[in-house]
Amino acid sequence: MTVLIHVLGSDIPHHNQTVLRFFNDVLAATSENAREFMVVGKDDGLIDSCPALSVQFFPGKKSLAEAVIAKAKANRQQRFFFHGQFNPKLWLALLSGGIKPSQFYWHIWGADLYELSSGLRYKLFYPLRRLAQKRVGCVFATRGDLSFFAKTHPKVRGELLYFPTRMDPSLNTMANDRQREGKMTILVGNSGDRSNEHVAALRAVHQQFGDTVKVVVPMGYPPNNEAYIEEVRQAGLALFSEENLQVLSEKLEFDAYLTLLRQCDLGYFIFARQQGIGTLCLLIQAGIPCVLNRENPFWQDMTEQHLPVLFTTDDLNEDIVREAQRQLASVDKNTIAFFSPNYLQGWQRALAIAAGEVA
């Protein structure tokens, strides 16, 4: 039998490491279809830390795509599971027949679905990608992204699946002991990536709350981002007093990041697409409500799980935030579908579908 090959076709270290470690620690022991990987990027100790996996690394998108296409042509029974598909050459291969629909299964990460880049080459590529997406064997995504995708590709099969956020289920019932009164602390964005639109988000927070709240902006990832970090810092200082603005330029380890999140009262995410699900999960777990752009379809997943959702277009004040905190405290977090370990069932089903084990 030909085993399923998983493809991480772009060098996105943080997300790629999360996926590899999840497969190594959780899925590989029980499924032979959870062990073979082709990855763009450097080893950086991943092979040693993921002994249950067979991982082949490639220096760039082009070399990986060529290897995938060669395997696909050599054996039409070979199936591939693409995790976050940011590799144009692979889309073109699907469109041209180099990879067949029955070989192509795609877990949507959010940024790979939306057409937000305004550059000429992207505008030329997006129509071709849309045509290729009609040929995908099956897509796996959040409820909101499935709904978004189905509007333009109603005939493509879609299955619910959540990114494997690193979570400790024992923290679901831990009461957040932060004082829910006085000056609020607001987390702005989930990383230093420009897609967070930090400057616009800071202006929106200031418009809602003025200089009465403390704003925390985590920007330690991605690396080599100093110029943009300084741009955000200066924009923040034009709006907030120095004691009310904390721009973090160093990457935080997981436990330190968790501690930071638990010091917040509200998460504020202005981006108009699904992203940052890991940060959203950790905030919700800590009883901290989130403000989303109404164009971000993840609100559908949150309401499906009976979670309070605030929108950037709402008139926000402290009373509304405190009420959302109270509502969130009443939710049984052990039942939330996109929390660990509840998302495991979706992953087991996704593997079976992509491998052809179930119809």
From Swiss-Prot:
Its EC number is 2.4.1.325. This is TDP-N-acetylfucosamine:lipid II N-acetylfucosaminyltransferase. GO terms for cellular component: plasma membrane. Belongs to the glycosyltransferase 56 family. Catalyzes the synthesis of Und-PP-GlcNAc-ManNAcA-Fuc4NAc (Lipid III), the third lipid-linked intermediate involved in ECA synthesis. It holds the Pfam family Glyco_transf_56. Its main location: membrane. It is a peripheral membrane protein. It comes from Escherichia fergusonii (strain ATCC 35469 / DSM 13698 / CCUG 18766 / IAM 14443 / JCM 21226 / LMG 7866 / NBRC 102419 / NCTC 12128 / CDC 0568-73). GO terms for biological process: enterobacterial common antigen biosynthetic process; fucosylation. HAMAP family: WecF_RffT. One of its GO terms (molecular function) is fucosyltransferase activity. It is found in: Cell inner membrane.
